[in-house]
UniProtKB/Swiss-Prot annotation:
This is Mitochondrial import inner membrane translocase subunit TIM50. Residues 1-22 form a transit peptide. GO terms for biological process: protein import into mitochondrial matrix. Residues 193-456 are mitochondrial intermembrane. Belongs to the TIM50 family. Residues 23-171 are mitochondrial matrix. InterPro entries: FCP1_dom (IPR004274), HAD-like_sf (IPR036412), HAD_sf (IPR023214), TIM50 (IPR050365). The keyword Mitochondrion applies. It comes from Caenorhabditis briggsae. It is found in: Mitochondrion inner membrane.
Length: 456
């Protein structure tokens, strides 16, 4: 066999196998059979290829004739050859081959029709329903209320034994928890209710000694002390006694909040957390600082936060005392300043703040001013300094009536400036009235001949 024949035979085998493979039922669509009829299902419509086969006729050499062979007959295909003129004998061979192949195609069974998509979906639905029923039966079986398995005596006894075992474990756990709680309570009372002892180990007598319930009284007193530590100020006397002679003790005490009155906290991505100093703060401290007033910073901020801020802007030491959050009274979630613990005469104490809740224990001593939010064009401290200077110059024995009067306005410093301008205008008018009257008298005297009386 020549090389050309071998290559043609391999090529035909490859195409025949490919057609048979993709014509099988395994490659049918899941959506069902095609609506267009398959031309290869009808044996009468089979098309035949015409491979060329060499035939020896009357010893005249190789004569090529075309023999029609069904495409789907066998996996092997016949090699194709160029067509030549047909001989009468070739026609007989062709007719016989056609009859044989027609009989084979007619006797071969028709390909099975693949199931449709609706049938597959119905079967899938049936299988899912069966799985759901099986899962439901497994779930309801342990409950003991229904199911065929629970009707058996062995399963019922097992369920009852499990219930009794769980009940016993629950009872034992409750007893252990109750016993641990009792032991813990007794240990707590014994530790915190014991009497204090000195360095030698002797018992220190207190007001609860000799009582059968002394440990409980001591525990209640410990809770009270802890509450006072959190709620009440750190000490009963927040400021030391006034300066004795020959030192100069200012007559009036100014208690002022730090946050949003003198400085404003601000946080940015670039600078982080910092405090802005209010405009004219240095002038304000120069006016009200020692020896004019006894200035006390009383802030709700912690000492670690507020103390460095105060030291940064008070380099001249014009502020005498600093009180922080530990010196406030915690009431209803708010830090309240108790001025009665300042160890000063409240008739001469001026408390400046923007929050009315901070001075709710002593509202008559409070001068409420607007909150400063970092506006650098603000000049309220200048007006407030003039107001406090006026109070100092008035030398009043009780400043509370003046504070109550100005506290009725939203901005006391602004109202004071308005009244100061008004009084200055009134004084200017009073100064001008005597001059006008004297000029009128001199003019009228000259007019009516009374000059000699004026000269006399």
């Amino acid at each position: 066999m020549s090389l050309s024949k071998l290559s043609q035979k391999c090529f035909s085998r490859h195409h025949a196998r490919t057609f048979i493979r993709f014509s099988s039922s395994d490659f049918q669509s899941l959506l069902g059979p095609p609506r267009v009829p398959n031309p290869y299902a009808d044996s009468g419509r089979n098309k035949f290829a015409a491979p060329i086969v060499p035939i020896n006729v009357n010893n005249h050499g190789n004569v090529f004739a075309s023999i029609k062979v069904p495409i789907n007959e066998t996996p092997e295909a016949v090699a194709f050859k160029p067509e030549v003129e047909e001989a009468p004998r070739v026609e007989k061979v062709e007719v016989e081959a056609t009859k044989i192949e027609t009989e084979k195609v007619a006797s071969s069974p028709a390909p099975a029709t693949p199931p449709s998509a609706i049938d597959e979906l119905n079967s899938l639905k049936d299988s899912l329903s069966k799985l759901e029923e099986a899962a439901a039966s497994k779930t309801s079986a342990p409950s003991g209320s229904s199911g065929d398995n629970n009707d058996q005596p062995g399963n019922a006894e097992e369920v009852e034994a499990r219930r009794k075992r769980m009940e016993r474990n629950t009872r034992i756990g409750g007893y252990v928890l109750l016993g641990g709680s009792v032991i813990g309570f007794i240990s707590f009372c014994f530790y915190y209710g014991r009497a204090q002892r000195d360095e030698a180990g002797n018992v220190i007598a207190d007001e609860f000694s000799g009582s059968f319930l002394a440990p409980f009284y001591r525990i209640a007193n410990s809770f009270k002390l802890w509450k006072d530590y959190v709620v009440e100020p750190a000490r009963e006397q927040l400021l030391p006694d006034p300066l004795p002679a020959p030192y100069l003790q200012p007559k009036y005490t100014i208690v002022i909040e730090l946050k949003n009155i003198l400085v404003h906290p601000e946080w940015t991505y670039k600078t982080g957390y910092r405090f802005l100093k209010r405009p004219a703060l240095d002038y304000f401290l120069d006016v009200i600082g020692y020896p004019n007033f006894e200035v006390v910073i009383y802030s709700s901020e912690s000492m670690m936060t507020a103390a460095p801020v105060v030291d940064s802007f008070d380099q001249k030491q014009r502020i005498m005392y600093k009180l922080f959050r530990d010196c406030t009274k915690y009431m209803n979630g708010h830090h309240v300043k108790d001025l009665s613990k300042l160890n000063r005469d409240l008739s001469k104490v001026i408390y400046i703040d923007f929050d009315a809740k901070s001075g709710q224990l002593n509202p008559e001593n409070m001068l409420r001013v607007p909150e400063w939010r970092g506006n650098m064009d603000d000049t309220s401290l200048v007006d407030l300094a003039e107001l406090l200077k006026t109070i100092h110059l008035s030398d009043a024995e009780d400043v509370r009536p003046m504070l109550q009067y100005y506290s009725q306005y939203d901005d006391p410093a602004k109202e004071f400036r308005r009244r100061a301008v008004y009084l200055a205008q009134q004084e200017e008018q009073k100064k001008q009235q005597p001059d006008d009257s004297s000029m009128l008298k001199r003019y009228s005297g000259r007019l009516f001949g009374f000059r000699r009386h004026a000269s006399a």
